[in-house]
Regions:
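Hydrophobic h-region of N-terminal signal peptides that target proteins for export
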Residues: 9-19
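Extended, compositionally biased alpha-helical segments that mediate assembly or anchoring
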Residues: 429-432, 446
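Terminal low-complexity/disordered tails
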Residues: 422-424, 431-434, 438
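Repeat-solenoid scaffold signature
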Residues: 224-332
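Long, compositionally biased charged/polar accessory segments in the mid-to-C-terminal portions
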Residues: 294-334, 338-346, 351-355, 367-391, ...
């Protein structure tokens, strides 16, 4: 039977290269797990699987340049101020990996059958991964039906992970959440379901399973940028005065006046209050502001961005880097200033936090919070720190382990704001920034006050 199926599949392979077709002709279950589906997929799509296995969506790391050093960095080894790190927490974190079975450091990245084709190509809307199952599909999913109805990705495929990063809707990004599945024009003019109806890959163009674009949080040194200029020229306005702004002001700055337009986004996470006997409360939007196992949170909706100069490059804290606990630790942040001719003013979400660090070694700790003996199990920070550091291969390679002493330090993490582009009628107006406008902090940006008023003050090289 398998031989016959393979013959039929091969007969369709050339057709599949040019157009979608009915996979019911070549896919036959039943399937007990996702990797069983993949085994059938690669009978025709082995080359595609090999392409995908070269992507950062599979490896969760990318070689990149940070100031003064070349690093391999990605979700695999970065530290954030949400759930902190995947080390020791893999079964929970890797529910967003496009693969099956990444339970710990022994995961085999060369095993093609572990690639999850369905999470990106499901068209039924029924494919769901176990929240803490190391990427495996939920038992209730009809894998045969999903596999027989695959197609090009749509927003919901990407959103399965990117809308829910950090453990919930709108937690991390601020400009990506469930409202982007079928957005109205006021939410995003590009993805507007009744208008342009862009899919993610309309802008994040893809070739050989390599998807353009890099997130600052995990790949601050990534050199695969996309931007408004990919479609729009440098003089997009009829008003010449507005066009003079484009050399120093990014399109997003004026055209994304607010993020988290529909769903509140997390703006602060304080781990230091975890374990305290406090009442679990909710804010006006129904979001929890304290959880015993996670600490305290702050959420905001319709958030004006924070603005900073950005020249397309960024820097980041790497596991094992020394810190000064008296300072706010910047986990990722944009580079550039008013003197940099390549920099423009961009909008950002800045997520602040208070997270655990080794107070003897002065390094950030990657605690084990999930699973047996994790913090959520034992509520023991010393044990969670010891186990998390032991599970972190980067720390082990640097000869670092938990010293037995810990504290909590203030951190911040910068996130680029690129989505939720408003209709042009809702873009910022001159008076939002100039004259009495308070939108931009001129002095924080390096100006001597409003440059419209102080024409002899400090200027950007392009002004």
């Amino acid at each position: 039977m398998k031989t016959m199926k393979l013959v039929v599949a091969l007969a369709f392979c050339s057709q599949m290269a040019y157009a979608e077709f009915d996979h019911k002709e070549v896919i036959e279950g039943p399937f007990t797990q996702g990797s069983d589906v993949t085994e059938q997929c690669i009978e025709c799509h082995e080359d595609h699987a090999k392409e995908f296995m070269k992507s950062s969506h599979w490896t969760w790391e990318l070689e990149q340049e940070l100031p003064g050093r070349t690093v391999k960095r990605g979700k695999k080894n970065s530290i954030n101020n949400f759930c902190v790190s995947i080390s020791g927490n893999e079964p929970r974190c890797t529910s967003c990996h496009a693969g099956y079975g990444w339970k710990d450091n022994s995961f085999d990245f060369t095993d093609m059958t572990k690639v999850d084709c369905l999470v990106c190509h499901d068209t039924t809307g029924t494919y769901i991964k176990e929240p803490a199952g190391a990427g495996e599909a939920m038992a209730k999913v009809n894998l045969e039906r999903v596999a027989q109805n695959v197609g090009q990705p749509v927003r919901d495929n990407c959103g399965t992970c990117h809308f829910y990063g950090g453990g919930g809707d709108a937690v991390k990004h601020g400009d990506l959440d469930s409202s982007m599945s079928y957005p109205e024009k006021d939410t995003d003019v590009h993805m507007d379901t009744d208008g342009n109806d862009f899919q993610c890959q309309t802008c994040h163009t893809t070739a050989s399973h390599q998807i353009s674009g890099n997130a600052m949080g995990v790949s601050p040194g990534g050199e695969n940028p996309i931007g408004c200029e990919n479609c729009h020229d440098s003089a997009p306005h009829d008003n010449k005065k507005l066009n003079t702004h484009t050399a120093a002001v990014a399109c997003q700055t004026c055209h994304i006046p607010f993020f988290a337009r529909n769903e509140p986004t997390k703006m602060r996470w304080d781990w230091s209050t975890a374990g305290q006997e406090l009442t679990e409360t909710k804010d006006k939007n129904g979001k929890k502001t304290f959880m015993n196992k996670k600490g305290s949170f702050e959420w905001q909706k319709m958030v004006p961005p924070q603005y900073a100069w950005f020249n397309g490059k960024a820097d980041a804290y790497m596991a094992g880097d020394k810190i000064d606990p008296a300072q706010v630790i910047k986990l990722t942040y944009p580079l550039g200033d008013i003197n940099d001719s390549k920099a423009k003013i961009y909008p950002f979400k800045v997520h602040t936090g208070k997270q655990i660090f080794d107070s003897k070694l002065n390094i950030l700790i990657t605690p084990k919070v999930f699973g047996k003996n994790g913090y959520w199990d034992k509520f023991d920070w010393d044990l969670a720190s010891k186990l998390g550091m032991e599970a972190n291969t980067t720390m082990k390679d640097k000869g670092l382990s938990y010293s037995g002493e810990h504290g909590f330090v203030e951190t911040e993490m910068w996130w680029r704001i690129n989505h939720m582009v408003s209709p042009k009628e809702q873009a910022l107006q001159c008076s939002d920034c100039h004259n009495k406008g308070q939108r931009l902090g001129w002095q924080a940006l390096g100006y001597d006050g409003d440059p419209m008023k102080n024409k002899k003050g400090k200027r950007h090289p392009t002004d």
